[in-house]
Design a protein with these regions (language model features):
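C-terminal boundary and immediately downstream tail of ABC-type ATPase nucleotide-binding domains
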Residues: 211, 221-242
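ABC family nucleotide-binding domain
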Residues: 1-220
């Protein structure tokens, strides 16, 4: 589904990604973790072309992302992306936020988009807030709206870039519960997160990054049980002891 091959990227003279290679199979959940500045958010943004790469290749469902001929807006309509900050339209109601992409990109009628949007809001537990505006909702509720909005486009896979890091601690669980449910339903997911409980529960594999490199790429049992690198061991001892 997602193939990342020898990907390198620079910001000016600073190399942010170095020769990264991995893949995510259909139905697989892969968690990407690592210290701040390790390149994990940059890597996931490269997957749908939000960040260009200078070297290597990324293929999503048979489409080469870094090919100049690739229609990136079309590709992104099939790849759901949920960010740290919710990126909702503040001047639109919740249901309007879910309908606009379906109508403008997928060509659905307003009625179809509304019906699909309401089903998804029900699924993430906020159907009762459909006519409210984003500013009237908590951070956790807004992030659940963002997930529902991504799902409304019927994506073939979902990318999450630290979806809980901007939330108050008590709101994190409500977002993770939705993500766990998605994973259990077989959605292909690539998730940048520090939530190791989530990784232990639903990840098939864990990728650990440091200084722009993939240091570990292992089944979760192996990663949590016996990571190969000293750097991953240090990271886990710090993050799991707090």
């Amino acid at each position: 589904m997602i193939q990342i091959q020898n990907v390198s990227k620079w910001y000016g003279s600073f190399q942010v990604l170095t020769d990264c290679t991995t893949q995510v199979s259909k139905g697989e959940v892969v968690v990407v973790c690592g210290p701040s500045g390790s390149g994990k958010s940059t890597l996931i943004k490269c997957v749908n072309g939000l960040e260009p790469i200078e070297k290597g290749s990324i293929i999503v469902n048979g489409t080469k992302v870094n090919d100049p001929a690739t229609d990136l807006p079309k590709l992104r309509s099939h790849v759901g992306m949920v960010f740290q900050h919710f990126e909702l339209f503040p001047h639109m109601s919740i249901i309007q936020n879910l309908a606009i992409g379906q109508v403008k990109v997928l060509g659905r009628s307003q009625d179809e988009a509304h019906e699909r949007g309401m089903k998804l809001l029900d699924r993430v537990g906020i159907k009762m807030h459909a006519n409210k505006y984003p500013g009237e909702l908590s951070g956790g509720q807004q992030q659940r709206v963002a997930i529902a909005r991504a799902l409304s486009m019927d994506p073939i896979c979902m990318l999450f870039d630290e979806p809980t890091s901007a939330l108050d601690p008590e709101m994190i669980t409500e977002v993770l519960d939705v993500m766990v449910e998605l994973a259990q339903e077989g959605m292909t997911m690539m998730v940048v997160t520090h939530e190791m409980g989530f990784a232990r529960k639903v990840a098939h594999r864990v990728i650990f990054m440091d200084h722009g490199q993939i240091v570990e790429d292992a089944p979760k049992e192996e990663f949590f049980g016996k990571p190969h690198s000293d750097r991953a061991q240090q990271f886990l001892s710090k993050i799991l002891n707090h």
